[in-house]
Amino acid sequence: MKMRLAFRVLTLAFAFALAVAQPSRAADTVTVDDTARFLAGMPPSADSPLAPLTKDPAWQRHARFFDQAFGQLEQRQLAKIRAWSDTNLAAPRPTMYYMFSGPDFLYADAFYGKATTYVLSALEPPGSVLDLARLPRGGVGAALYNVERSLSSILSFSFFITKQMRVDLHAGQISGTLPILYVFLARSGKTIHGVTPVALDENGLVISENLGKSAVRGVRIMFAANDGVERTLYYFSTDLSNPGVKASGFLKFCATLAPGNSLLKSASYLLHSGNFTTVRDFILANSATIIQDDSGIPLVYYNQKRWRFFPFGRYAGPIAEFPGRYQESYAELFRRAQPMDFGIGYRWRSHESNLLLAVKLPDDGSGVADAVAPDAPPPKPGRPRVPRPIEPQRGGLFFWFGR
């Protein structure tokens, strides 16, 4: 009897020790979602190894800064963009393409929040985020400061100043686009479930070994929004010029997800040039809708019989950094533009911004499948005035991310 009682006591003690030890071991691991929240100035899980670091004055200052900056951005732009999208997009497709995007998930989500697969692409490599809990003293504050600096332009305007960001994101313990994607996902209310490095072979197939010179490297992020729907974000580091895309399988991979919707914003007018015709043709052929500012696809390349146009805002021409990109056809189209209450692109002030919603018609040319925006009567012509140039930021020009 005594031996049986002792065995039971020993069994209960072991079970209790196991129950206590398991959460402890789990808590030793920093999850990607906690890392994203920490970088975004949001509290991680209570049992996260990062939780004690939130008592650091550097993190608390960082959190206050991002709370204010993202709060202002939400009120000034993001909430208005989501309302615009709800009003003007009738049936968004599951796939969303964002070429020349950099890590700009923020506006991809604002315009196409109902997408389930996002494909972002630019030259900058995905980079990495080290275990922040293991950084040396002072390392966390430096990492957070670099993130703040790299986001300063997009939080103030709606685009990255890439030269500045490239320096900031290679100056410390974090690098590339991944930390910025983390911040934007967390601040957009997403929960990250997993992050996996990926690569594409020349046929557009996802591979993990025997990577050749033409392999396109990237990252796949699995996440969910408040609706609980599992979503996928791909970011690929790739050259989108004609030689670049012809030598890689990136567009072949994108074609497996077609048709989708496309966003083109602050794209350095690269799609105006003859060196980006392949990606331009792909976007036109594989998009049901295209949302763009005037730095996207010139109007002349749209088949007028296949597309219907809904202009918003005011076309004031390109900023001084991009001379020779003025479009007479754009100016003519925007004479019937509807008003817009938010700014976007290089001309980020709301009274100077332009946005074009291009909707592809069904093959028979009847109806409008993916938009509900009504045509507006032409406004009364106003007195012409010379567009005011944008004030340059210190640290670089307004080029496509990674250029």
Each model region followed by its residue ranges:
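Bacterial N-terminal signal peptides
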Residues: 8-19
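Sec/Tat signal peptide C-region and signal peptidase I cleavage site
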Residues: 20-26
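Non-globular targeting/processing and membrane-anchoring segments
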Residues: 27-153, 231-403
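Short aromatic loop motif centered on NTY/YTY
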Residues: 169-172, 194-235, 239
